[in-house]
Amino acid sequence: LSGTNGQVSNTLVIGAGDSGKAIVCTYTNTRKSTTFRLAKAWSANSTAGNIASLAATTGLINNTAVLNSTASTATNGTLVTVFAGETATLPAETMSPGTLANYTTTVSCDAGTLTGTNGQSAGNTLAITAAATATSPITCTYTNTPKTATLQLAKAWGANSSASDSASIGATTGGTNNTTLFSTAGGTAAN
């Protein structure tokens, strides 16, 4: 036999001594496989102590287990074996304690074909392609990023304000980025 790859042509030479014998060539198909896991990442300014939960995947022969991650520690789930041609339905992230509405959650995978990137939505899927089995492990990472807003303090003076009036507004506290103290004289708006 000139080779053992059943996906290319091979030549079998039958010798004179094999004449009349039953010769059997067996082709064995082995499904391509790799390992797969879910992972959790937290962006800067995530609230320490928030706990995100990812339920098990569905749709695979070997589904992932539940993954819990406490901010702000990145966490990798347990590896499972997956096969080319499978499609994993990825779980929607939940949170307790903490408020999921305070975060955006994106999901990204380093191999395969991902459909959907909102980690808070159900129905995102990952198709395990034959090419994806070259990556080991395939990792789908859910990343939480705190939502932000702009806080601006302002002082406006009414129509009957005196030019001799003044006001000072102190700095805010307790935020990641706090405002600073500012003062203004009567009749002059400030922010």
PLM regions and their residue ranges:
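Tryptophan-paired
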Residues: A56-M95, G170-N191
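Tandem-repeat architecture and repeat-register "anchor" residues
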Residues: T4, G15-G17, T26, A39-A41, ...
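Short, surface-exposed beta-strand/strand-loop-strand elements in extracellular ectodomains
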Residues: G49-T58, T105, S164-T173
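Structural motif
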Residues: K32, L38-I51, K147, L153-S166
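Low-complexity/repetitive intrinsically disordered segments
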Residues: L1-N29, L151, S168-N191
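Short strand-edge motifs at loop-to-beta-strand transitions and within beta-strands
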Residues: N10-L12, I23-C25, T75-V80, N124-L126, ...
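Surface-exposed interfaces of beta-sheet-rich extracellular modules
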Residues: L1-V8, G85-S121
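Conserved "repeat-terminator" motif of extracellular CCP/Sushi domains
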Residues: I14-T34, K40, I128-A149, K155
